[in-house]
From Swiss-Prot:
The keyword DNA-binding applies. The gene is mutS. ATP binds at residues 626-633. It comes from the Bacteria. Disulfide bonds: none annotated. It comes from Bordetella avium (strain 197N). This is DNA mismatch repair protein MutS. HAMAP family: MutS.
Length: 875
């Protein structure tokens, strides 16, 4: 906001300017009664972004002050729109009593809402996390990137360190909604979320460490196993300071911090995550994706956990096997216990029970932040009442050690449910300010005040009857509204009968409203009781929150157990419904899939052709040839997704599968220009290939699709050959290498660990039939002519292409492109083709003679234009 001289303003506006200076560049929602008002540039910006009315209030230096506002009751929907636009908002509330204030009522900023610090359900996506992350870069001598990220809506706090070159991939893995970093730091990343800069001193080692020690109330960070991650500790300290400032309080629900180290997860760069369409399609849609297919969770927290699993496949076999065993136990229990649980079976009964639970993970976080709503506590109370039933369902599943551990986590202190059942009304109001939240019988003083207020109804009925009798006014009414309080209403035609002790309170068009000493005395008594009851209720609500805050950690643990049960149940149900199998887990890096299917594509088409794949120490690369539209890309993605599912602990779509330890998955699939970055399709292709060659290992899975197609034939072939050979001899990665260069099929004769496979197709009277079946050996042709015909290319163009192919083959063209135009034409087409060929030869001869007579270096611009028109006439 431009500099404003506050001395000439009213005390209220002076207060606003002080608070706006504190908020800085953030939009300031300044509470004034039933509205949050904005002034100056904030008002103009809000009016533009929110489409609210821009008005004026007072003047500044002779000019009207712009003002815009939003109703308090609708604040959340406006906040959601602003946050979606990447804006941050400071919320300023009235904390003083307007009745007692001699000047402006006391106000202060109570919280700051940013894209990464959301905790309110109305602002958060139900099935995705909105993490806040911080990045710290170390010096040039030993360059490291430290990353800390916090899910404020659950309290999960993590750190990791990586090489600066890996920072972008790590940020895409974490997927934060907001990134915090120092003022002096420059980041070369493709991350596109909100960014917030803070002073450099927030990241200083001593201060950051001290802040963490103070928060966790400990003398050492050794217990968190992060002492050897100094750069990440700097990021964590700065992040915690930033998050606490936005909430204007300590983050009591953030009770631990965990380190994620290299080797825990199968790494995937941003390109791979996008190409595999894990949680978002290539066009940016939420479905159909792997997540949308698998997510049949009954709780939002289960869906969020499943999403995290898909983005964090595990490298080690032990935790993968634990999930696998849990799914197998759920499936076997469904059959073994059908007699006990009826036709639905245990799995379905368990999943139905999970559907009764609210989002306890986020409720626990809001409880710690004192922003939990009364109805959320009521839903928590009702859920805890069903917890024993759920524990009964999980108890028989002890064949899985992991399920047995989850059953233990579900055990909560009965005092939580007892307090909630006694304290919270059966159907509480939306907010504590409305009253009716604390249950009757919980507090004797509150019950007495409520009784006093409730008795007013009987008193008013009796008063109305007495006054009608005393005045003779039969239509006299005693009523109440929030503006004028209690009053006696008399129609205009009866006002001459009004007694002397009636005092006029309000004049209407057809009636007069009065107050009497008796009614005034009762009003004071009742309104005082209502005010005192509400104040008492607010105080009691705070006491309930104080008592419940001691149970935030066990509630969070129970929520985590419920989420995992839900995610495992969803995977089990999908495996049951679609006949997925448990893959064998191997220690070595290999993939062996029998009759595998693409998990997403098979649901989109009527019939899907299963395929095999074997990659191991003796067969490290498959060179894949075959027709366009034959299914090469689908096959490659299918193998990668089955491997990824296996490493998450899920069952997989196959008859049988064996998947070993994989450290990374890379994909080079598809083509798209990077217009913003000024990079062509071919440049993008080479950049991705370079990253694969630099980072893939003998334990990596690499998918390379049509490398080299973005340049000339010779360049493309040479690059494809060299890249394929490098992957075999140097990187030794498990590689699926799809190509249209037929020459590459000679590579297996030189490299024993390479093999040819192709996507089969068959010709029929009606054209080509793509079998989508992977067979051993190279393809004989690509059937490009048939694909072109099916795409609607004109027949004349098809004939012309066929003639050109014949000419090239007659000249011994070095790169036939897999016999792209080798399909035979029928007799009529052959005759027409010969006639066209003869005519074209004559035209080409005339064109050649005309060109030989032109010296382009000696032509003037006008002569060049005339020559061009002569050549055009020869067409």
């Amino acid at each position: 906001m431009s500099t404003v001289d506050s001395s000439s303003h009213t005390p209220m506006m002076q207060q606003y300017l002080r608070l706006k200076a504190e908020a800085g560049p953030l939009l300031l929602f300044y509470r004034m009664g039933d509205f949050y008002e904005m002034f100056y540039e904030d008002a103009e910006k809000a009016a533009r972004l929110l489409n609210v009315t821009l008005t004026k209030r007072g003047t500044s230096n002779g000019a009207p002050i712009p003002m815009a506002g939003v109703p308090v009751h609708a604040m959340e929907q406006y906040l959601a729109r602003l946050v979606a636009l990447g804006e941050s908002v400071a919320i300023c509330e009235q904390i003083g009593d307007p009745a007692a204030a001699k000047g402006p009522v006391e106000r202060r900023i109570v919280r700051i809402v940013t894209p990464g610090t959301l905790t309110d359900d109305a602002l958060l996506p139900a099935k995705a996390d909105r993490a806040l992350a911080a990045v710290c870069l170390s010096g040039k001598r030993d360059p490291r990137a430290g990353i800390a990220w916090l899910n404020l809506a659950s309290g999960e706090f993590h750190v990791t360190e990586c090489a600066p070159a890996q920072l972008d991939s790590e940020l895409h893995r974490i997927g934060p909604a907001e990134l915090v970093y120092a003022d002096s730091t420059e980041l070369d990343i493709t991350y596109s979320g909100a960014r917030s800069r803070v002073p450099d001193w927030h990241f200083e080692a001593d201060g950051a460490r001290s802040h963490l020690l103070t928060h966790f109330q400990t003398d050492s960070l050794a217990g968190f196993d992060i002492e050897d991650m100094p750069v990440a500790v700097c990021a964590a300290g700065a992040l915690l300071r930033y998050a606490a400032r936005t909430q204007s309080q300590a983050l009591a629900h953030v009770q631990t911090i965990s380190a994620e180290r290299a080797g825990m997860y199968v790494l995937m760069d941003p390109v791979t995550r996008r190409n595999l369409e894990l949680t978002q399609t290539l066009s940016g849609e939420e479905a159909p994706t792997l997540f949308s297919l698998l997510d049949d969770c009954r709780t939002p927290m289960g869906s969020r956990l499943l999403r995290r699993w898909l983005h964090h496949p595990l490298r080690e076999n032990a935790p993968v096997a634990a999930r696998q065993q849990a799914i197998a136990t759920l499936l076997s229990a469904r059959l073994d216990m059908a007699q006990t649980f009826g036709a639905a079976g245990l799995l379905e009964t368990l999943r139905s029970a999970l559907g009764l639970f609210p989002d306890i993970e986020r409720i626990a976080a809001r409880l710690a932040l004192r922003s939990v709503r009364p109805r959320e506590l009521a839903s928590l109370r009702d859920a805890l009442a069903t917890l024993p039933q759920l524990q009964t369902l999980v108890a028989p599943l002890s064949a899985s050690p992991r399920l047995a551990e989850l059953a233990t986590q579900l055990t909560l202190d009965p005092a939580i449910a007892d307090l909630l059942s006694r304290a919270i009304a059966q159907e509480p109001a939306l907010a504590i300010r409305d009253g009716g939240v604390i249950a009757s019988g919980f507090d004797a003083d509150l019950d007495e005040l409520r009784l006093l207020a409730a008795d007013s109804g009987e008193f008013l009925v009796q008063l109305e009857a007495r006054e009608r009798e005393r005045t003779g006014i039969s239509n006299l009414r005693v009523e109440f509204n929030r503006v004028h309080g209690f009053y006696i209403e008399v129609s205009k035609g009866q006002t001459d009968k009004v007694p002397e002790d009636y005092r006029r309170r309000q004049t209407l068009k057809n009636a007069e409203r009065y107050i009497t000493p008796e009614l005034k005395s009762w009003e004071d008594k009742v309104l005082s009781a209502q005010d005192r009851a509400l104040a008492r209720e607010k105080w009691l609500f705070e006491q309930v929150l104080d008592a419940l805050s001691a149970y935030v950690r066990p509630l969070s643990d129970a929520a985590a157990a419920l989420a995992e049960l839900d995610a495992l149940g969803s995977l089990a149900e999908h495996a049951r419904r679609h006949e997925w199998v448990a893959p064998d887990l191997l220690e070595s890096a290999e993939i062996d899939i029998d009759a595998g299917r693409h998990p997403v594509v098979e649901h989109a088409i009527e019939r899907f052709t299963p395929n095999h794949c074997r990659l191991d120490a003796t067969r490290r690369m498959l060179l894949i040839t075959g027709p366009n539209m034959g299914g090469k890309s689908t096959y490659m993605r299918q193998v990668a997704l089955i491997a990824l599912l296996a490493r998450t602990g899920s069952f997989v779509p196959a008859r049988r599968a064996r998947v070993g330890k994989i450290d990374r998955i890379f994909t080079r699939i598809g083509a798209a220009d990077d217009l913003a970055g000024g990079r062509s399709t071919f440049m993008m292709e080479m950049t991705e290939a370079a990253a694969i060659l630099a980072a893939s290992t003998s334990n990596s899975l690499v998918l390379m699709d049509e490398i080299g197609r973005g340049t000339s034939t010779y360049d493309g072939l040479a690059l494809a050959w060299a890249i394929a050979q490098r992957l075999i001899t140097h990187n030794r990665a498990l590689t699926l290498f799809a190509t249209h260069y037929f020459e590459l099929t000679r590579l297996p004769s030189e490299q024993a660990t390479a093999a040819n496979v192709h996507l089969a197709a068959a010709e029929s009277a009606g054209g080509i039939v793509f079998l989508h079946e992977v067979r051993e050996g190279p393809a004989s042709r690509s059937y490009g002519i048939q694909v072109a015909q099916r795409a609607g290319i004109p027949a004349a163009v098809i004939r012309h292409a066929t003639r050109e192919l014949e000419r090239l083959e007659a000249q011994g063209a070095p790169t036939p492109q897999l016999g792209l135009f080798a399909a035979a034409l029928d007799a009529e087409a052959q005759t027409q083709a010969q006639a066209d060929h003869d005519a074209e030869n004559a035209a080409l001869l005339a064109l050649h003679e005309a060109l030989s007579g032109i010296d382009p270096d000696s032509l003037t611009p006008r002569e060049a234009l005339e020559a061009l028109y002569r050549l055009k006439a020869l067409q």
